[in-house]
UniProtKB/Swiss-Prot annotation:
The modification N6-(pyridoxal phosphate)lysine is found at K210. The gene is hisC. It comes from Pseudomonas savastanoi pv. phaseolicola (strain 1448A / Race 6) (Pseudomonas syringae pv. phaseolicola (strain 1448A / Race 6)). Pathway: Amino-acid biosynthesis; L-histidine biosynthesis; L-histidine from 5-phospho-alpha-D-ribose 1-diphosphate: step 7/9. NCBIfam families: hisC. This is Histidinol-phosphate aminotransferase. Gene3D superfamilies: Aspartate Aminotransferase, domain 1, Type I PLP-dependent aspartate aminotransferase-like (Major domain). InterPro entries: Aminotrans_II_pyridoxalP_BS, Aminotransferase_I/II_large, HisP_aminotrans, PyrdxlP-dep_Trfase, PyrdxlP-dep_Trfase_major, PyrdxlP-dep_Trfase_small. The lineage of its organism: Bacteria, Pseudomonadati, Pseudomonadota, Gammaproteobacteria, Pseudomonadales. Belongs to the class-II pyridoxal-phosphate-dependent aminotransferase family. Histidinol-phosphate aminotransferase subfamily.
Length: 350
């Protein structure tokens, strides 16, 4: 601890991101990136924006992208918030909407950034246990709270909560903000954005990193009632008025407009996921139902940490979590057929 630190910094437990190896020959199945490239129209839009205008600040409101998102989801632009990746959007949500006297509620197995944000902003929280099938029990959230947040599909399990159960949670807490974190929704679920006009306490977050193949661009969004969006804008403009650069604005807008590319790559990921599930089950793995671009699997005869280490020795990287309830699972990102073949060959050697 440095004498120059603010006192609270020594108590922070930072988020640990998935490994980004420098060696390109590795088969990288650990951070849920899309194996297929972004929309060619998005790439062309960004190339066209490489002009002398880069000397100018970008639009602080990102109106081009904001209107593209609003048109896509059939909402008003003042119902859309944009940030530098969904992690920044989530950080602003925790700061703007969850600092109350009661405890914030979220699942015991969920996105590990949630407790990090709570520590950063001094938010009390309670983790609600998933059931034995790693599913949310909606009735467990019908209790006093400072807000509710959960990933759907779940990260890291990939399990999907049906929209009827999502709505049950929202209805039970009309005086609290309910955030549905939909980073992976496009790979097998129905978005809760269809509910935002009915529930002023609902906020839905998404990212362009997964189904739009733009993880390197850092674009996240939230959709909800304009009152919630205003709170986020106030926090954003007290922190960084220009979170999205010119490339993100034009590239993100073009990605939303290119529905054909989106549908094509999404369908390829889903087909590859189902094929990999069958192949892993054929090798004795137990695989949880997944609505995401990854699967969560365990083998009854092999320790998960040891499997991950041995796969790495063979040039294949997957994600292992040390958390007690899931310590025997591996999270495996959906890749190309060639990457899956390398994974399966590595497992055969083990």
């Amino acid at each position: 601890m440095s004498k120059f630190w603010s006192p609270f910094v020594s108590g922070l437990v930072p988020y640990v991101p998935g490994e980004q190896p420098k060696l390109t020959r590795l088969v990288k199945l650990n951070t849920n990136e899309n194996p297929y490239g972004p929309s060619p129209k998005a790439v062309e839009a960004m190339r066209a924006a490489l002009t002398d205008d880069l000397r100018l600040y970008p639009d602080p409101n990102s109106d081009l992208l904001k209107h593209a998102v609003a048109d896509y989801y059939k909402v008003q632009p003042n119902q859309v918030f944009l940030g530098n990746g969904s992690d920044e959007v989530l950080a602003h949500i925790f700061h703007a909407l969850f600092q109350h006297d009661a405890s914030l509620l979220f699942p015991d197995i969920s996105y590990s950034f949630y407790p990090v944000y709570c520590g950063l902003y001094g938010i009390d929280y309670e983790m609600i246990a998933l059931d034995d099938q790693f599913q949310i029990r909606a009735e467990d959230y019908a209790k006093p709270n400072a807000g509710i947040i959960f990933p759907n599909p779940n990260a890291p399990t990939g399990c999907l909560l049906g929209l009827d159960k999502v709505e049950q949670i929202i209805k039970a807490s009309p005086d609290s903000v309910v955030v549905v974190d939909e980073a992976y929704i496009d790979f097998g679920g129905e978005t809760a954005i269809t509910l935002v006009d009915r529930y002023p306490n609902l906020l839905v977050t998404q990212t362009l990193s997964k189904s739009r193949s733009l993880a390197g661009l850092r674009v996240g969004l939230a959709v909800g009632h304009s009152d919630l969006i205003e709170a986020l804008e106030r926090v954003k403009n007290s922190f960084n008025s220009y979170p999205l650069d010119r490339m993100a604005n034009v590239g993100g807008a073009a990605a939303f407009e290119d529905r054909e590319h989106f549908e094509s790559t999404r369908n390829k990921v889903i087909e590859s996921r189902e094929a990999l599930v069958e192949q892993l089950q054929g090798k004795g793995f137990e695989v949880l139902p997944s609505a995401a671009n990854f699967i969560f699997a365990r083998h009854p005869q092999h320790d998960a940490a040891a499997l991950a280490a041995k796969l790495r020795e063979q040039g294949v990287i997957v994600r292992h979590f040390k958390q007690q309830r899931i310590a025997q699972f591996l999270r495996i990102s959906i890749g190309t057929p060639e990457q899956h073949q390398a994974l399966l060959e590595g497992l055969s050697d083990i």
